[in-house]
Regions:
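A ligand-binding cleft/hinge motif common to bilobed small-molecule-binding domains
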Residues: 5, 12-13, 17-40
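A short acidic, often aromatic-flanked loop/helix-cap motif at beta-alpha or helix-coil junctions
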Residues: 5-8, 48
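Extracytoplasmic low-complexity repetitive segments enriched in small/polar residues
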Residues: 10, 14-16, 77, 121
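Extended ligand-binding regions for polar small-molecule ligands
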Residues: 25-26, 43-116, 127-129, 150-152, ...
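C-terminal capping/gating helix-and-loop segments adjacent to ligand/active sites or protein-protein/ligand interfaces
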Residues: 115-143
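Secretory-pathway glycan-assembly enzymes, especially type II membrane glycosyltransferases
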Residues: 139, 147, 151-152
Length: 163
Protein backbone atom coordinates (compact mmCIF):
# COMPACT_ATOMS: atom_id res chain seq x y z
CA UNK A 1 0.00 0.00 0.00
CA UNK A 2 1.30 3.43 -0.84
CA UNK A 3 -0.93 5.56 1.37
CA UNK A 4 -2.26 5.22 4.91
CA UNK A 5 -5.85 5.60 3.70
CA UNK A 6 -5.38 2.56 1.43
CA UNK A 7 -4.19 0.47 4.38
CA UNK A 8 -7.12 1.59 6.50
CA UNK A 9 -9.58 0.82 3.70
CA UNK A 10 -8.07 -2.66 3.27
CA UNK A 11 -8.23 -3.27 7.01
CA UNK A 12 -11.82 -2.03 7.17
CA UNK A 13 -12.74 -4.36 4.28
CA UNK A 14 -11.24 -7.34 6.11
CA UNK A 15 -8.28 -7.70 3.74
CA UNK A 16 -5.87 -7.21 6.69
CA UNK A 17 -6.14 -8.77 10.13
CA UNK A 18 -4.20 -6.06 11.94
CA UNK A 19 -2.91 -2.59 11.34
CA UNK A 20 0.07 -1.05 13.09
CA UNK A 21 1.48 2.43 13.35
CA UNK A 22 2.02 4.86 16.23
CA UNK A 23 -0.82 5.06 18.76
CA UNK A 24 -1.91 8.54 17.74
CA UNK A 25 -2.10 7.41 14.11
CA UNK A 26 -4.09 4.31 15.03
CA UNK A 27 -6.49 6.32 17.12
CA UNK A 28 -6.97 8.92 14.39
CA UNK A 29 -7.48 6.28 11.67
CA UNK A 30 -9.86 4.26 13.85
CA UNK A 31 -12.53 6.96 13.66
CA UNK A 32 -12.54 6.55 9.85
CA UNK A 33 -13.58 2.88 10.06
CA UNK A 34 -17.16 1.91 9.17
CA UNK A 35 -17.65 0.56 12.71
CA UNK A 36 -14.96 2.26 14.83
CA UNK A 37 -16.29 0.89 18.12
CA UNK A 38 -15.71 -2.67 16.89
CA UNK A 39 -11.95 -2.03 16.90
CA UNK A 40 -9.51 -1.30 19.69
CA UNK A 41 -6.06 0.21 19.93
CA UNK A 42 -4.02 -2.16 22.05
CA UNK A 43 -2.27 -0.58 25.04
CA UNK A 44 1.07 -2.29 24.39
CA UNK A 45 3.89 -0.18 23.01
CA UNK A 46 5.93 -1.96 20.35
CA UNK A 47 8.31 0.89 19.61
CA UNK A 48 8.71 4.48 20.69
CA UNK A 49 8.69 7.17 18.03
CA UNK A 50 8.63 10.66 19.47
CA UNK A 51 6.66 13.08 17.35
CA UNK A 52 6.97 16.82 17.43
CA UNK A 53 6.75 19.95 15.34
CA UNK A 54 8.88 20.17 12.22
CA UNK A 55 9.75 23.02 9.88
CA UNK A 56 11.56 23.22 6.58
CA UNK A 57 15.33 23.11 6.71
CA UNK A 58 17.25 26.36 6.56
CA UNK A 59 15.06 28.59 8.69
CA UNK A 60 16.63 28.38 12.14
CA UNK A 61 14.71 31.37 13.51
CA UNK A 62 11.33 29.89 12.55
CA UNK A 63 12.45 26.52 13.94
CA UNK A 64 13.28 28.17 17.28
CA UNK A 65 9.93 29.97 17.40
CA UNK A 66 7.99 26.78 16.67
CA UNK A 67 9.98 24.70 19.17
CA UNK A 68 9.75 27.30 21.92
CA UNK A 69 6.03 27.83 21.30
CA UNK A 70 5.54 24.16 22.24
CA UNK A 71 7.96 24.56 25.15
CA UNK A 72 5.92 27.51 26.43
CA UNK A 73 2.81 25.33 26.52
CA UNK A 74 4.62 22.52 28.36
CA UNK A 75 6.25 24.85 30.88
CA UNK A 76 2.97 26.68 31.45
CA UNK A 77 1.37 23.38 32.43
CA UNK A 78 4.26 22.60 34.77
CA UNK A 79 3.82 25.96 36.52
CA UNK A 80 0.01 25.72 36.65
CA UNK A 81 -0.51 28.55 34.18
CA UNK A 82 -3.72 28.17 32.19
CA UNK A 83 -5.55 30.17 29.56
CA UNK A 84 -7.85 31.36 32.34
CA UNK A 85 -5.20 32.54 34.82
CA UNK A 86 -2.36 33.59 32.49
CA UNK A 87 -2.83 37.35 32.94
CA UNK A 88 -2.78 37.07 36.72
CA UNK A 89 0.54 35.20 36.57
CA UNK A 90 2.30 38.43 35.61
CA UNK A 91 2.31 39.26 39.32
CA UNK A 92 3.56 35.82 40.45
CA UNK A 93 6.27 35.62 43.11
CA UNK A 94 8.08 33.04 40.97
CA UNK A 95 10.65 34.72 38.67
CA UNK A 96 10.49 31.79 36.20
CA UNK A 97 6.73 32.24 35.86
CA UNK A 98 7.17 35.98 35.36
CA UNK A 99 9.76 35.32 32.63
CA UNK A 100 7.45 32.82 30.96
CA UNK A 101 4.52 35.26 30.74
CA UNK A 102 6.77 38.15 29.71
CA UNK A 103 6.54 40.20 32.92
CA UNK A 104 10.34 39.97 33.40
CA UNK A 105 13.31 39.43 31.15
CA UNK A 106 13.38 39.44 27.39
CA UNK A 107 12.72 35.84 26.33
CA UNK A 108 10.94 36.96 23.16
CA UNK A 109 13.87 39.09 22.02
CA UNK A 110 15.96 35.97 21.40
CA UNK A 111 13.45 35.03 18.68
CA UNK A 112 12.76 38.53 17.36
CA UNK A 113 9.41 38.60 19.17
CA UNK A 114 7.88 40.93 21.72
CA UNK A 115 7.65 39.95 25.37
CA UNK A 116 3.94 39.09 25.21
CA UNK A 117 4.33 36.35 22.59
CA UNK A 118 4.34 33.53 25.14
CA UNK A 119 1.45 35.03 27.10
CA UNK A 120 -0.61 35.19 23.90
CA UNK A 121 0.10 31.51 23.20
CA UNK A 122 -1.06 30.49 26.67
CA UNK A 123 -4.17 32.69 26.55
CA UNK A 124 -5.23 31.64 23.05
CA UNK A 125 -4.17 27.97 22.95
CA UNK A 126 -3.76 27.08 26.61
CA UNK A 127 -1.04 25.07 28.26
CA UNK A 128 -0.09 21.66 26.87
CA UNK A 129 -2.58 19.84 29.09
CA UNK A 130 -5.45 22.11 28.07
CA UNK A 131 -4.61 21.70 24.40
CA UNK A 132 -4.25 17.91 24.72
CA UNK A 133 -7.58 17.63 26.53
CA UNK A 134 -9.44 19.77 24.00
CA UNK A 135 -7.89 18.34 20.81
CA UNK A 136 -7.08 14.73 21.70
CA UNK A 137 -8.63 13.44 24.93
CA UNK A 138 -12.08 15.01 24.58
CA UNK A 139 -12.38 13.69 21.02
CA UNK A 140 -11.82 10.14 22.25
CA UNK A 141 -8.73 9.71 20.10
CA UNK A 142 -6.30 9.09 22.98
CA UNK A 143 -7.98 9.82 26.32
CA UNK A 144 -4.94 8.65 28.30
CA UNK A 145 -1.95 10.96 27.91
CA UNK A 146 0.57 8.18 28.61
CA UNK A 147 4.05 9.54 27.85
CA UNK A 148 2.50 12.89 26.90
CA UNK A 149 2.44 13.76 30.59
CA UNK A 150 4.86 16.11 32.28
CA UNK A 151 8.00 14.42 33.60
CA UNK A 152 6.74 15.19 37.10
CA UNK A 153 3.74 12.91 36.42
CA UNK A 154 5.66 10.02 34.86
CA UNK A 155 5.66 11.30 31.29
CA UNK A 156 8.50 12.44 29.08
CA UNK A 157 7.63 16.12 28.66
CA UNK A 158 10.05 18.69 30.02
CA UNK A 159 11.50 21.96 28.83
CA UNK A 160 15.22 22.72 28.68
CA UNK A 161 16.29 25.87 30.51
CA UNK A 162 15.94 29.15 28.60
CA UNK A 163 18.11 32.01 29.75
Amino acid sequence: FEKADEVVAAYDAGRCDTYTTDKSGLAAQRIKLSKPNDHIVLPETISKEPLGPVVRQGDAVWEDIVRWSLNVMIEAEEYGITSANADSMKSSDNPAVKRLVGAEGELGAAFGLDNDWSLRIIKQVGNYGESYKRNIADTGILPDRGPNQLWTKGGILYVPPAR
